[in-house]
């Protein structure tokens, strides 16, 4: 069974990232799955890769901190060596540490930018370089946030990193478009993931349903469905976009 292509997904151990891996594999992609290189996350990645292989697709585990350039270079190189190329990069990994502006430390700020903005830049840079070398169309996809549009009280560092990612996405689209490489990002609203539940609690998430036009929160699978389209050939005329997927939250 030939592959539709090869996709790298960062932040893949749980939540939205995991759902994206499952969806892209179901779409026919072979996958390289990434998350932090600690025992707990690697165990989750290994289990996920085994689940994907059981469906007939290829899957490799490429753990590492995507804020480090040498690590991202190795992730791309290992993927090319073991799976044959890179057609889709989903730079999904991100962190969110809540803190008022007046008590946010420089270290908190820098760590957030390193993962959420520099990490996406490095993924786009090295996957984009590989796509150019391959001489065929590719898809760069970033994990944004509604906070990149609206700001986020108690989350200024996070919101700023996601706003920066919007500009990065637009810039990459304009640079790489002539080579058939598109760059887009998805900006979820409230989605029930381990990260959001850990930061806000289930009671808060339940209370937010009424703030959405559809009277519900999103699921990781909702986000994965959008990524599935952005990764497809059918999305070729969409680029430079950060697409809000928020149940109408900003429109009511």
Curated annotation (Swiss-Prot):
PROSITE patterns: ADH_SHORT
Family per similarity comment: Belongs to the short-chain dehydrogenases/reductases (SDR) family.
Source species taxonomy: Eukaryota, Fungi, Dikarya, Basidiomycota, Agaricomycotina
Class in the EC hierarchy, top level: oxidoreductase
Name of the molecule in the record: Short-chain dehydrogenase/reductase eriH
Pfam families reported for this sequence: adh_short_C2
SUPFAM superfamilies with a match to the protein in the record: NAD(P)-binding Rossmann-fold domains
An example Gene Ontology biological process: fatty acid elongation
Gene Ontology MF term list: oxidoreductase activity, acting on the CH-OH group of donors, NAD or NADP as acceptor
Keywords tagged on the record: NADP, Oxidoreductase
Residues annotated for NADP(+) binding in this entry: 16, 65, 92, 125, 158, 162, 191, 193
Pathway it works in: Secondary metabolite biosynthesis
Catalysis: reaction(s): cyathadiol + reduced [NADPH--hemoprotein reductase] + O2 = cyathatriol + oxidized [NADPH--hemoprotein reductase] + H2O + H(+); 11-O-acetylcyathatriol + A = 11-O-acetylcyathin A3 + AH2; cyathatriol + A = cyathin A3 + AH2
Active site residues of this protein: 158 (proton acceptor), 158 (proton donor), 162 (lowers pka of active site tyr)
PANTHER family cross-referenced by the UniProt entry: 3-OXOACYL-[ACYL-CARRIER-PROTEIN] REDUCTASE, CHLOROPLASTIC (PTHR42760:SF40), SHORT-CHAIN DEHYDROGENASES/REDUCTASES FAMILY MEMBER (PTHR42760)
Disulfide bonds: none
InterPro entries reported in the protein's UniProt record: NAD(P)-bd_dom_sf, Sc_DH/Rdtase_CS, SDR_fam
Enzyme nomenclature, EC number: 1.1.1.-
Protein's job: Short-chain dehydrogenase/reductase; part of the gene cluster that mediates the biosynthesis of erinacines, cyathane-xylosides that show unique biological activities, including leishmanicidal activity, stimulating activity for nerve growth-factor synthesis, and agonistic activity toward the kappa opioid receptor. EriH also catalyzes oxidation of 11-O-acetyl-cyathatriol into 1-O-acetylcyathin A3.
């Amino acid at each position: 069974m030939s592959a539709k292509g090869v996709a790298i997904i960062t932040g893949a151990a749980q939540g939205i990232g995991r759902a994206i891996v499952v969806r892209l594999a179901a779409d026919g992609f072979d996958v390289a799955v990434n998350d932090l290189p600690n025992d707990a996350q690697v165990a989750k990645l290994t289990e996920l890769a085994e689940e994907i292989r059981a469906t007939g697709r290829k899957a490799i585990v490429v753990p590492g901190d995507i804020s480090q350039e040498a690590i991202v270079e190795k992730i791309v190189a290992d993927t090319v060596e073991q799976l044959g190329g890179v057609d889709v990069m989903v730079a999904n990994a991100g962190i969110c540490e809540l803190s008022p502006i007046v008590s946010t430390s420089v270290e908190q700020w820098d760590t957030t930018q390193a993962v959420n903005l520099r990490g996406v830049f490095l993924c786009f840079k090295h996957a984009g370089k590989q796509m150019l070398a391959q001489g065929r169309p590719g898809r760069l996809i970033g994990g944004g946030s509604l906070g990149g549009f609206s700001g986020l009280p108690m989350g200024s560092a996070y919101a700023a990193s996601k706003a920066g990612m919007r500009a990065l996405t637009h810039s990459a689209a304009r640079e790489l478009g002539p080579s058939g490489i598109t760059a887009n990002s998805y900006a979820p609203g409230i989605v029930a993931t381990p990260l959001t539940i850990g930061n806000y609690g289930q009671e808060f998430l339940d209370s937010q349903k009424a703030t959405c036009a559809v009277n519900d929160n999103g699921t990781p699978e909702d986000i994965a469905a959008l990524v599935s389209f952005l990764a497809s050939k059918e999305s070729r005329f969409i680029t430079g976009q950060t697409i809000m997927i928020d149940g109408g939250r900003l429109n009511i």
